[in-house]
Amino acid sequence: MYIKQVTDNKETWWGYLLTTFLIVPIAVILFSIPHGVILTSKAFGDEELMAKIASGDMAAMMSILEPNLNLFLMLLPFVGMLLAVFFSTKIIHKNTIRELTTSREKIDWSRVFFAFGLWGSISATMIFLDYNFFTPENYEWNLNLGPFLILFAIVILLLPIQTSAEEYFFRGYLMQGIGVISGNRWLPLIVTSLAFGLMHYANPEIAKFGNVVYVFYI
């Protein structure tokens, strides 16, 4: 039902290709420019540091700016991605955000908050047990209220946008697009799951815990 509800707009199949290979990349690049400009201005005159930035050395990039500013700038491209997906959904395909989100008549926010509460409770319980019973030496109380409040604001405002951008693009927009173009039910699920997993290949948890972590992405 989720894919079927948008198959009436098959004539806009080209929009899925245009969005995937042009509109989304351009939006991500545009929203990445502030980070690049600030990094370059900070490293200007230091040839070694500039070379590291040009090579994509994440450690070097992270060392240049204040951590909260770095996080804010790194999350900005996801704002561009989400806006691009919404733009294409509304303007090119003439679909609604509700149709991109669910096959139900309206978005069921109670399910969203239930899932958030469930995983939040599981995570909090695991951290509590780990801190109190298993490896308390891995934790250190180091509260600096000013930076913490800034970090809290960034996390509350931008992390939901990051996760929504990824999910809407891969599990929503691409899944519907591949379904519309291929007319197949299984192909969209397989392709988007693999693509979502590969996108997270460079994540640090993959290097630390191994490829088994892919299960959580796929």
Where on the chain are the PLM-derived regions?
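Membrane-interfacial loop-to-helix junctions in multi-pass transporters
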Residues: L143-A153, S182-I190
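Membrane-interface helix/loop boundary segments of multi-pass membrane proteins
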Residues: A165-V191
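Small-polar-interrupted transmembrane alpha-helices in polytopic inner-membrane proteins
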Residues: P188-Y201
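Membrane-interface helix caps and helix-loop-helix hairpins in membrane proteins
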Residues: F134-W141, H200-F209
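Functionally important transmembrane alpha-helices
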Residues: G210-I218
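Hydrophobic transmembrane alpha-helix segments characteristic of membrane transport
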Residues: I91-G117, P136-E140
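Mid-bilayer segments of alpha-helical transmembrane spans in multi-pass integral membrane proteins
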Residues: F116-L129, P160
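N-terminal, membrane-interfacial amphipathic/helix-forming hydrophobic leader that caps
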Residues: M1-T96
